[in-house]
């Protein structure tokens, strides 16, 4: 959520920055609500002062032995008027809060201005794509004989679900274990195991709600539709980041570096017809997430470091990849700046996203009331960052395609062999 004072001080400047990411700020609506808020606030102060002054007259009148019934009636009337003004004020404030919740974050000044993914800027490429001396298969054809079972997934749950069996399932598990071991052992993150079901407050805090309700799986307890709504997590960013909600941290507790391996559940409501073949876009997929809670002055250095941590996984797996900076029009709702890491998929002859690392600055912290006490004892909002480290299923896809052999086998990347106990599967 944006700082409302930015809007009060220079709404046109905010509107211009938001326009860069394709969002039209309704300045007239804000100015109208803000005018009503100020008017009601003044009215409340006026009524409160008048009621206080009138109440004092009661004691004076009683001291003189005068009848106070008229004064009491006036105080009661003023009380009713004040209550009505307070209710009206709360209504306008609620509208302002809801309106603020729907506005995306402001892009950082270093973010390239652009409309969509075509305007993203490549930062670097690492690794050289392998040259094959046989016809390359995609991960579906490579994986099917090895235990990648889409038919059973569809039978059990419908489209965009997959069953992994045998060595494919072991490889999937090994990938996640390697990622967690690297982030906890080499990168300094603390491992967490968090719930897969959360309440709407948590999703409001990290920005998935209210804007992205259609992309969530809503669950009910015992089929009770009147119960407080709960949702399957779309990413463990939600749970990890919300561990600091409604919290005042000590400066010595920062930075907080957290990681978790979890399934992620997404309805993919806006993705009809996209990536219908294979594991690229699933309703359920695993991801190892990195979350950092930082002092504001350190958050952009932390973003670069987090990108490096995601890159280290790809480097260790010896998978070619590139890093891109997302333009203003392609960034996520809560992000001030985002880097995507894209891995090379030889069957598609292109790079595909495997990690997204974002600095949300104080956007989530303001929604969650996540603060720290600075050196002067003043409470300040923290900055929150999140990044995939990495998407496990897409990493499996990349390994199947980049490490495939002519005989149908797949070479196990060197760093995964201790987890697998073998150097290849299939064949």
From Swiss-Prot:
Reaction(s) the record says it catalyses: tRNA(Ser) + L-serine + ATP = L-seryl-tRNA(Ser) + AMP + diphosphate + H(+); tRNA(Sec) + L-serine + ATP = L-seryl-tRNA(Sec) + AMP + diphosphate + H(+)
Ligand binding (L-serine): 235-237, 289, 388
GO molecular function, one term: ATP binding
EC number(s) from the headed UniProt entry: 6.1.1.11
Keywords from the UniProt entry: Aminoacyl-tRNA synthetase, ATP-binding, Cytoplasm, Ligase, Nucleotide-binding, Protein biosynthesis
Pfam families according to UniProt: Seryl_tRNA_N, tRNA-synt_2b
Location in the cell: Cytoplasm
Protein family (similarity comment): Belongs to the class-II aminoacyl-tRNA synthetase family. Type-1 seryl-tRNA synthetase subfamily.
Source organism of the structure: Chromobacterium violaceum (strain ATCC 12472 / DSM 30191 / JCM 1249 / CCUG 213 / NBRC 12614 / NCIMB 9131 / NCTC 9757 / MK)
Binding partners and assembly: Homodimer. The tRNA molecule binds across the dimer.
This protein's pathway: Aminoacyl-tRNA biosynthesis; selenocysteinyl-tRNA(Sec) biosynthesis; L-seryl-tRNA(Sec) from L-serine and tRNA(Sec): step 1/1
NCBIfam families: serS (TIGR00414)
Function: Catalyzes the attachment of serine to tRNA(Ser). Is also able to aminoacylate tRNA(Sec) with serine, to form the misacylated tRNA L-seryl-tRNA(Sec), which will be further converted into selenocysteinyl-tRNA(Sec).
Protein name: Serine--tRNA ligase
Binding residue positions for ATP: 266-268, 353-356
Gene designation per UniProt: serS
Family annotation (InterPro entries): aa-tRNA-synt_IIb (IPR002314), aa-tRNA-synth_II (IPR006195), aa-tRNA-synth_II/BPL/LPL (IPR045864), Ser-tRNA-ligase_type_1 (IPR002317), Ser-tRNA-synth_1_N (IPR015866), SerRS_1_N_sf (IPR042103), SerRS_core (IPR033729), tRNA-bd_arm (IPR010978)
Record note on domains: Consists of two distinct domains, a catalytic core and a N-terminal extension that is involved in tRNA binding.
GO cellular component, as recorded: cytoplasm
GO biological process: selenocysteine biosynthetic process; seryl-tRNA aminoacylation
Main location: cytoplasm
Record carries keyword Aminoacyl-tRNA synthetase: yes
């Amino acid at each position: 959520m944006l700082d409302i004072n930015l809007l009060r001080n220079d709404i046109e400047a905010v509107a211009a920055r938001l326009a860069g990411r394709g969002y039209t700020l309704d300045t007239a609506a804000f100015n109208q609500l803000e005018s009503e808020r100020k008017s009601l606030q003044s009215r409340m102060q006026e009524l409160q002062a008048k009621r206080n002054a009138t109440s004092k007259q009661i004691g004076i009148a009683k001291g003189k032995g005068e009848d106070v019934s008229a004064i009491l009636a006036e105080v009661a009337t003023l009380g009713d008027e004040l209550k009505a003004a307070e209710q009206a004020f709360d209504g306008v404030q609620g509208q302002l809060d809801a309106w603020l919740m729907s506005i995306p974050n402001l892009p950082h000044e270093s973010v390239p201005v652009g409309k969509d993914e075509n305007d993203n800027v490549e930062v670097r490429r690492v690794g050289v794509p392998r040259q094959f001396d046989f016809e390359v298969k995609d991960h579906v054809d490579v994986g099917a004989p090895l235990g990648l079972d889409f038919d059973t997934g569809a039978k059990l749950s419908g489209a965009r679900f997959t069953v992994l069996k045998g060595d494919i399932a072991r490889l999937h598990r090994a990938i996640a274990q390697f990622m967690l071991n690297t982030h906890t052992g080499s990168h300094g993150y603390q491992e967490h195991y968090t719930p897969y079901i959360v309440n709407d407050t948590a999703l409001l805090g990290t920005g998935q709600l209210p804007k992205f309700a259609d992309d969530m799986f809503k669950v009910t307890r015992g089929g009770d539709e009147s119960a407080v709504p709960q949702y399957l997590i779309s990413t463990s960013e939600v749970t990890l980041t919300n561990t600091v909600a409604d919290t005042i941290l000590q400066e010595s507790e920062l930075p907080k570096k957290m990681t978790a391996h979890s399934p992620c559940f997404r309805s993919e409501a806006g993705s009809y017809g996209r990536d219908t073949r294979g594991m690229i876009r699933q309703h359920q997929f695993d991801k190892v997430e990195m979350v950092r809670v930082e002092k504001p002055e350190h958050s952009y250095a932390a973003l670069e470091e987090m990108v490096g941590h995601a890159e280290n996984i790809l480097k260790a797996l010896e998978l070619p990849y590139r890093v891109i900076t997302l333009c203003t029009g392609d960034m996520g709702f809560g992000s001030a700046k985002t880097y995507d890491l894209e891995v090379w998929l030889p069957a598609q002859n292109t790079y595909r996203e495997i990690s997204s690392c974002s600095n949300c600055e104080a956007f989530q912290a303001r929604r969650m009331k996540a603060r720290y006490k600075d050196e002067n004892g003043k409470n300040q909002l923290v900055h929150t960052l999140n990044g995939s480290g990495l998407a496990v299923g897409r990493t499996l896809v990349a390994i199947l395609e980049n490490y495939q052999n002519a005989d149908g086998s797949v070479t196990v990347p060197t760093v995964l062999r201790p987890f697998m106990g073998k150097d290849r599967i299939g064949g």
